[in-house]
């Protein structure tokens, strides 16, 4: 894609189209909530970063196949050249994205929201950002701001969760 900025680009990420003289670090769009707001029957986020995440991935693909109508699966696809990390670290970068809650794993099934992976011990956003060269220009204060935005977004998603949703399929958790 040419490593160009999009509405889904994380806050503070370097891209080939990011202005360098006066960078503007807008927050990324919440694609899952946008899609769910359009009444799509099944919306989910997926990533491959650990065995529990693989089980979550499979369950969501299976569920999407069962749902009638339009389904939307937002799959995290790390990009070594664009994100500036070694290719052999792709699974680790995906794991850090999820475990830092920067890329929450969730689903909205016919309007019922559920966080499907809750890290028992979330890693600081700085670990996810530090694994990639595209965030190397950020100051400690900017990283703290991103951490607060990630925390606020997680809290918003947790508040959207439907009562009793954990009874349907328990959220997995990293040990």
Predicted regions and their residues:
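Thiamine diphosphate
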Residues: 1-69, 87
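Histidine- and/or cysteine-centered catalytic micro-motif in compact active-site loops
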Residues: 48-49, 76-78
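Flexible, low-complexity linker and terminal segments
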Residues: 77-175
